[in-house]
Amino acid sequence: MKCGVRGSDTVEERAVPQGNVPGERYSPTQPFSVDMPSIGNQTLKESDMWGATAFDQLMCRIAFKGLRHEGVYTPPGLDPALQFPGSLGGMNWGSVSVDPTNSYMFVNDMRLGLANYMIPRDKIAAGASGIEMGVVPQTGTPFGAMRQRFLSAVGIPCQAPPFGTMSAIDLKTKKLMWQVPVGTVKDTGPMGIRMGLPIPIGMPTLGASLSTQSGLLFFAGTQDFYLRAFDSGNGNEIWKARLPVGSQSGPMTVSDPR
């Protein structure tokens, strides 16, 4: 990293859950960065289940109790399991941005779970495409897979918000400086209905951020249609502008050769 400091100095191998798929080989450990903050990959509990109403919260609690969830690195198996974060990514969709002057790193994350299980080859229905959610054929392997986003009956994540945040890490101290939810339900909502409300609950984020030497952090990868600027020192939103559609990529700058 070209800011005069290192990222994680210590990587530790830790024991992780083992799967139950016949013929599969599982690593007994996985690497963990032990001296850097952990962002958005907590082990979920039944009490973390949430809903827009008491009904869908109850349905999420019932669904959670029917899933095997052993925290990060929960492997798929023959029984339904919950991976959190899911395959859409945690803090790795849009990568990070770095302020090399102050040695700050900025990370946006996506907190969406994925429920899945493996299906023996002879039990996969003909015509499965693997497009979007549902059955993934995994042709040429002994098993296919069923995958579904861990959402409530009205189409919102089952765990309590925030569903996406922006975080700042001081690379000199390796401490979390600040973390704020990003994104509102203005352009989305239950059952795909736009709520039009600027409630900052923190939505799943896509794209990446852009940090500048002037102390600004730009970001547009939220579920509402805004380009935002944050104070990189404290995470306060200091400006935003409406976009015609949502953004799934990172902002960029240009330099005037004059």
Locations of regions flagged by a protein language model:
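Noncatalytic, solvent-exposed loop/strand surfaces
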Residues: 1-258
